[in-house]
């Protein structure tokens, strides 16, 4: 739980200057759902009860972070995700390495994907965008069109 708290505090620090209603839309990468999923699949916590609901209560209830209207989970096969990471440019938070500690482990990637899909089944605010087709990654245009379709279906745009 301590890792979840650190991520929540970091997010709270970044968001405390946000004024509700200031923008029509806010698109945030790796928000509360990401913290909840990754904390729930850590090796050390696999035998403990799922902490996803605890993380949501911490970030939304205690820190009063703005609630996401929708979470978009872009579903990519872990092997393809690993290939995509290798194409990224320099990222200072990985200290010059190509992958961070979570990206390095195929097991973590597989558990995270499974937990995102499970969570999408349990919660109405998570939409799964399929990024893989029969022949690998779908095109950016196809993925973008599906994203727009999901947002329209949910009256987000």
Language-model features, listed with the residues they occupy:
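ATP-dependent small-molecule kinase phosphotransfer cores
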Residues: 1-63
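Conserved catalytic core of Hanks-type protein kinase domains
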Residues: 9, 30, 74-75, 84, ...
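Structured loop/turn residues at beta-strand edges in well-structured enzyme cores
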Residues: 21, 66, 124
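Short beta-strand segments at enzyme active-site cores
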Residues: 27-29, 74, 127-130
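A glycine- and Lys/Arg-enriched "phosphate-lid" helix/loop adjacent to the NTP-binding pocket
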Residues: 35-114
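NTP-dependent small-molecule kinase module
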Residues: 79-157
């Amino acid at each position: 739980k301590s890792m979840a708290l650190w991520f929540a505090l970091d997010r709270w620090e970044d968001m405390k200057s946000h004024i509700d209603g200031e923008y029509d839309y806010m698109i945030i990468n790796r928000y509360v759902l990401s913290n909840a999923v990754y904390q729930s699949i850590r090796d050390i916590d696999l035998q403990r009860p799922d902490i996803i609901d605890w993380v949501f209560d911490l970030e939304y209830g205690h820190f009063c972070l703005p609630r996401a209207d929708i979470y978009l989970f872009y579903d990519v096969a872990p092997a393809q995700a690993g290939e995509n990471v290798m194409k990224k440019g320099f990222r200072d938070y990985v200290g010059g390495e190509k992958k961070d500690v979570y990206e390095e482990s195929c097991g973590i990637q597989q558990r995270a994907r499974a937990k995102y899909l499970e969570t999408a089944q349990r919660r109405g605010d998570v939409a799964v965008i399929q990024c893989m087709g029969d022949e690998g990654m779908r095109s950016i245009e196809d993925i973008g069109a599906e994203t727009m379709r999901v947002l329209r279906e949910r009256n987000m745009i």
